[in-house]
Amino acid sequence: IGCSPENSQVMIQSVRAGRILDLPSLPTLSDGTAGGVEPGSITLDFCREFVDEYMTVTESEIKDSLQEFIQAQHMLIEGSAAVAVAACKKQGDRFAGKNVVVVICGGNISLETLKEIL
């Protein structure tokens, strides 16, 4: 499952269109997924081939997931990683009783953003 912030759905919309789209994005805590897809990037083809479905999460869901993950795991993650955590939480009933892997990478979060979410 691929996931994006509602405020920046460029990848999802590009996959659906079958080509890289130049779409506006609103501010998001998920800096790493914000904005466009670079021309010539392998990312679009990779997503088209290996991602079966897509979903979005709100800024509130990203913020809540950041806070909860930091508190529960005592690890710092960035907003992009929290998008995946938020998506998994959003699908909780679907995954109940199953083994689920959420790919979490990156701790690149500014002090200003960290202060904002805490």
Identify the role of each PLM range.
Residues 1-49, 95-96, 100-118:
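Glycine-rich phosphate/pyrophosphate-binding loop at beta-loop-alpha junctions
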Residues 40-96:
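Active-site-adjacent helical/loop segments in soluble small-molecule enzymes
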